[in-house]
Each structure stands twice: as structure tokens, then as C-alpha cells.
Amino acid sequence: MAKNYYDITLALAGICQSARLVQQLAHQGHCDADALHVSLNSIIDMNPSSTLAVFGGSEANLRVGLETLLGVLNASSRQGLNAELTRYTLSLMVLERKLSSAKGALDTLGNRINGLQRQLEHFDLQSETLMSAMAAIYVDVISPLGPRIQVTGSPAVLQSPQVPAKVRATLLAGIRAAVLWHQVGGGRLQLMFSRNRLTTQAKQILAHLTPEL
């Protein structure tokens, strides 16, 4: 059966968007607020009608992820910021495979996310309460699967009270995108053997987005 590279590319961009946001948070203490909202909201939507619907139904919501994906796919340098993004992206893929193969882990994750939906009736998605709740899910359900993702950045930033919770919540969004990626036919071999196909698809999607003003 032919693979749907449109859906695969969108889901992969979702993983890369989380990786980029984690990087921004770890180095600067803040990140692209709109992209963060899209990524965090993707955790909550358990029954989307399509791959694009997971990310709010608009390709523009994944602009950060698509641009990051192109950087990861075409990284000539294995050092510096691009290497960080590649490491985060691949680490999320590895953890997703461990999540999917761990008995009962996906059910536990689903139950915990249902709890988030109840909290959303009283708190905003980016409130400290929700961030802490999402971070706790990552710590309780994802971290024990190992290996842990080593987040690198500014020590002063990473020691501030709110940033670690935001980073973990964003990593949880990355896991959600990685689950989706596998569901639509994604696999790590594509990063080696279908790189050109993925690059072309990402460029095509970006080409018909309205330019940022």
C-alpha cells in the first residue's frame, strides 16, 4: 500500500515543532506562543478527524515544525543547534516506540489525558496548573520508559521554576506527534531512505502558506 507522505510529513513536523520549542525554552526561557498552543492542544484532542485536525486543521499551525524538519533533514552539520534538534527528534521517536510496546502504557496515558480534559473546563491550556499536570504525565508515564532526553540550554533558564514544566509538557506533545507519525505510516528508515520525498513534501506545504509579515 502506498504511503501517504502528506500525513507522514505533517506528523513529523509535529515532532520537530516540539523539538524546536523545547530548544527555545531551554535556551531563552520562552518560545513561539502560537506554535506552543498548537502543540499542547494536540495532546488534548483524542479523536481527531484527520492528521491535520490534530494540529488545529491548518497547515500554517505547523510552520515552525515544517521549517525545523527541513533543517533536520538537510543538516550538514552534526554540531550546535541543529544537532540538538536532531537529537530531540530522534529521542522522541525512540520513546514513542517504548511507549507503544510497554504493556498498558498507552492506556495509562489515555486515562491521564482524559483528566486533563476535565481540568480544561476550569483552567486555560497554558496556565501553570495545566502545564504542571502535563509535565507530571510526562514524568510519570514517559520518563520511566527511558532513555531520558537530556535537554541542554542555559543553566539559569533551566533552573527557573516554570521552564522545566513547560519543557516536559512540550516533550509530551512531541510524544503525541510521534504516536500519530507511526499511526499514519511513519518509520525511522524514512529519515534515511525517503529524505528527498519528505523534503519535497515539506517544501510544497510551506510554499502555499501565506508569508509571515
From Swiss-Prot:
Location in the cell reads: Cytoplasm; Cell inner membrane
Which InterPro entries does the record match to this protein? HflD, HflD-like_sf
- Indicate the principal place this protein occupies in or around the cell: cytoplasm
Q: Specify the signal sequence span.
A: none
Positions in coiled-coil regions: 79-126
Q: Its family? A: Belongs to the HflD family.
This chain belongs to which protein, by name?
High frequency lysogenization protein HflD homolog
Organism annotation: Shigella boydii serotype 18 (strain CDC 3083-94 / BS512)
